């Protein structure tokens, strides 16, 4: 974490249409990663199927240093097996596996469930670091201890934009919030901490979200939170995903309770056509990276 730089990545060609995933094709994944490589050498993914299982091998061919494979539903044997297969096939680049994203927060599983799963996965992948991801506040309580004891490193989501003061606060305060959260997490966890999700959407402007705000926030965060051996952050996210504003509404199973969130479409440092936003110019180029 000290010398590299991670970005949270979902393939631009992997989308949800009427509640069903499309398939990410290798050529599109390669095009995505070629755009990212000058600024990033680490990837954190969210899924292990529908074409995403090809990400580690393509990343390795482009000189990426590390991939943390995400498993969207680690209780689906096909998804977990695909992730484990990709990790075994690419041992030089796959450094970690993330078992789900906010599963406890969404009340789909418990800390105890995930702790047992981590033990099981570690038996199958003894050389790979095992983690899961929750919003930061979920790890503060004593009930999280059973899971924390089984995590080789912590992945955590820290979003200042969800705080009621964010829209009126300067970037200094938003970045300081992230630093303070990570410092508090060290009271409950002694291992490496990687903030998986932290960022600012670039629209809609009426919500206080603009490309300029995204750029200035990341610049301030990098100043206050420089990478260290035991603590760092990943840029969230690589690319815009316009479908994310509508995917719950498009899924009949969730249509009755879904709420539109237009900002969810605009987290990317690049738009859905891989065009850079202003924030990219303020992310330093990596030494030795292709240009």
Tell me what each language-model feature is.
Residues 1, 5-8, 12-21, 206-212, ...:
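Aromatic-rich peripheral "rim/lid" segments of glycoside hydrolase catalytic domains that contact
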Residues 71, 122-141, 190-199, 203, ...:
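Aromatic-lined carbohydrate-recognition surfaces of secreted/lumenal glycan-active proteins
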Residues 2-82, 86:
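N-terminal carbohydrate-binding/catalytic regions of secreted carbohydrate-active enzymes
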Residues 158-166, 187-218, 237-250:
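Active-site clefts of carbohydrate-active enzymes
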Residues 5-9, 41-45, 66-70, 95-99, ...:
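Hydrophobic faces of well-ordered beta-strands that scaffold small-molecule active sites
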Residues 54-137:
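Substrate-binding cleft of extracellular glycoside hydrolase catalytic domains
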């Amino acid at each position: 974490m000290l010398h590299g730089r991670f970005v949270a990545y979902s393939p631009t060609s992997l989308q949800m249409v009427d509640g069903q995933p499309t398939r990410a094709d290798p050529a599109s994944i390669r095009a995505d990663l070629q755009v990212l490589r000058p600024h990033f050498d680490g990837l954190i993914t969210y899924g292990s199927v529908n074409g995403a299982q090809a990400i580690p091998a393509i990343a390795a061919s482009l000189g990426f240093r590390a991939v943390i494979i995400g498993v969207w539903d680690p209780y689906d044997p096909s998804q977990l097996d695909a992730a484990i297969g990709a990790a075994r096939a690419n041992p030089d680049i796959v450094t970690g596996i993330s078992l789900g994203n906010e599963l406890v927060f969404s009340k789909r599983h418990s800390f105890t469930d995930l702790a047992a799963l981590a033990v099981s996965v570690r038996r199958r992948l003894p050389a790979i670091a095992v983690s899961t991801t929750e919003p930061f506040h979920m790890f503060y309580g004593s009930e999280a201890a059973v899971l924390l004891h089984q995590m080789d490193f912590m992945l955590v989501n820290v979003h200042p934009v969800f705080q009621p003061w964010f829209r009126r606060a300067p970037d200094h305060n938003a970045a300081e919030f992230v630093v303070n959260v990570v410092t508090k997490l060290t009271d409950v966890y002694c291992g490496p901490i990687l903030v998986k999700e932290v960022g600012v959407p670039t629209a809609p402007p009426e919500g206080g979200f603009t490309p300029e705000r995204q750029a200035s926030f990341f610049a301030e965060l990098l100043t206050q939170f420089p990478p260290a051996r035991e603590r760092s952050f990943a840029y969230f996210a690589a690319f815009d995903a316009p479908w994310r504003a509508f995917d719950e509404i498009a899924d009949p199973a969730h249509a009755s309770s879904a709420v539109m969130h237009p900002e969810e479409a605009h987290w990317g440092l690049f738009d859905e056509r891989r065009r850079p936003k202003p924030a990219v110019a303020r992310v330093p180029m990596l030494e030795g990276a292709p240009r």
